[in-house]
Amino acid sequence: MKTPRPLPYHVVPCNEHEGKGMADWNEGYVTDVAYTFGYYSELNPLRSKLALLNRRLHCPDFQTGCELGFGQGVSVNIHAAAGPATWVGTDFNPAHAAFAQELSVAANLGARLFDDSFEQFAARDDLPDFDYIG
């Protein structure tokens, strides 16, 4: 049996998890299994626009998009690269968030990607009003 190759990301310690016991920091979320590196076209805001246009409804342009639970961040970073909108998102797994942040920085996309829980993310006071949430 071959030895598996290490995954292409590193874990960045997250200060927000300090003080919580090891048994409860993840709040039941599975964090010991890496998510896939896939692109999910269902999250593409242009698909929503197409559906509205097919019904002869106007779809306004959007300036700010959000992806909740972005996994490795492939989709959110592709969307950030594909248009002028500002993208923000969160994934509870610190390793996933770190990899997604590295993608954004490497491509100079400016996406703001966090490793917050949904509760922490919703409580942030530095988020814009989102035009699109996927």
PLM feature spans:
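Conserved SAM-binding loop
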Residues: 100-101
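Conserved class I S-adenosyl-L-methionine
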Residues: 62-71
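Conserved SAM-binding motif I beta-strand of class I
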Residues: 86-91
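Conserved SAM-binding strand-loop segment of SAM-dependent methyltransferases
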Residues: 108-120
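Conserved short alpha-helix immediately C-terminal to the canonical SAM/SAH-binding motif I
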Residues: 95-96
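Conserved alpha-helix/loop element of class I SAM-dependent methyltransferases that forms part
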Residues: 32-63
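Conserved SAM-binding loop of SAM-dependent methyltransferases across substrates and taxa
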Residues: 72-84
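A short acidic, Gly/Pro-enriched loop at the edge of an enzyme's catalytic core
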Residues: 124-132
